[in-house]
């Protein structure tokens, strides 16, 4: 079976509304990308919670809608344009054919074993383990963020390897796939807890943890609050994004035992000052390492709590 993609270049102000309108008009999937991708004008952009919809797109955005080959693409564009108050003539579009493929095989071919730090391997289930003597996680791409391919995940994993939490309690806040929680457990942490706001992430983390024979408890935030579990930890790791990390500064800092360590990633090098400022009343954070423009911040909680806190 073949498919047809509708490709439309629009201003940032229309990108999200047009995406929704194309869905409503019959598109099977819609993506938004930088119209200047691959050129000197390409603009790195990372959507974060708290962003206005118009901020989560590029000045020149390319909206790509996948449709059945037999669909009336011109009618889909016209309906979408009308629903957002534009004339169809204002939306110039091109079409491109997409041949059907063995998508499972294609996806698998894009994921190879990943070597992280000194002795960690993340290996998809369809690959052989390169080094059975290493610390190995079997992990497939799935519903939740975290396969070790992104610099922020690697930074947190490398921090854990360099500061092995032997016998310590560890909290992975925003656990996603559970990759950091599992690494902590395989590095001989005592109690390990993962928390995420996404039920699908919890489902994914539980599946991955059972596959890797790790003992980790996973909770949604409300479930954790009602669990009776100790609410502070020797090590707290949060690989999220700068805006939510700033908003959660009092809560995350409050999860760290006196003398314990807090590790944050999901922070761009250009965002270091604003994130460290948010945590300054609680924990002094410094840049531990940087990869590809992303940083890991780390700091130790005071042994005694400052007056007034």
Swiss-Prot record:
This is Ribosomal protein L11 methyltransferase. InterPro entries: Ribosomal_L11_MeTrfase_PrmA, Ribosomal_PrmA_MeTrfase, SAM-dependent_MTases_sf. Gene3D superfamilies: Vaccinia Virus protein VP39 (3.40.50.150). CDD domains: AdoMet_MTases. It comes from Herminiimonas arsenicoxydans. GO terms for molecular function: protein-lysine N-methyltransferase activity. The keyword S-adenosyl-L-methionine applies. It is found in: Cytoplasm.
């Amino acid at each position: 079976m073949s498919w047809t993609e509708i490709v439309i270049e629009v201003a940032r102000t229309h990108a999200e509304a047009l995406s929704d309108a194309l869905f409503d008009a019959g598109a099977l999937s819609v993506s938004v990308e930088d119209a200047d991708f691959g050129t000197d004008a390409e603009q790195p952009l990372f959507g974060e919670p708290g962003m206005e919809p118009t901020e989560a797109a590029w000045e020149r955005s390319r909206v790509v809608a996948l449709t059945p080959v037999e669909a009336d693409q011109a009618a889909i564009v016209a309906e979408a344009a009308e629903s957002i108050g534009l004339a169809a003539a204002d939306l110039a579009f091109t079409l491109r054919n997409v041949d059907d493929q063995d998508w499972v095989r294609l996806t698998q071919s894009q994921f190879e074993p990943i070597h992280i730090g000194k002795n960690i391997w993340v290996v998809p289930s369809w690959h052989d383990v390169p080094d059975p003597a290493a610390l190995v996680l079997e992990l497939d791409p799935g519903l939740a963020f975290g396969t070790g391919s992104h610099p922020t995940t690697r930074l947190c994993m490398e921090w854990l390897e360099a500061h092995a939490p032997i016998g310590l309690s560890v909290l992975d806040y925003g656990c996603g796939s559970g990759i950091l929680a599992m690494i902590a457990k395989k590095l001989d942490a005592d109690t390990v807890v993962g928390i995420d706001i996404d039920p699908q992430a919890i489902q994914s983390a539980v599946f991955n943890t059972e596959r890797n024979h790790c003992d980790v408890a996973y909770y949604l935030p409300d479930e954790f609050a009602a669990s009776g579990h100790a609410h502070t930890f020797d090590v707290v790791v949060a690989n999220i994004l700068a805006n939510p990390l700033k908003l959660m500064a009092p809560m995350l800092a409050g999860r760290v035992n006196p003398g314990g360590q807090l590790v944050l990633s999901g922070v761009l090098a250009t965002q270091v000052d604003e994130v460290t400022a948010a945590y300054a009343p609680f924990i002094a954070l410094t840049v531990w390492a940087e990869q590809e423009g992303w940083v890991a911040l780390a700091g130790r909680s005071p042994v005694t709590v400052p007056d007034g806190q």
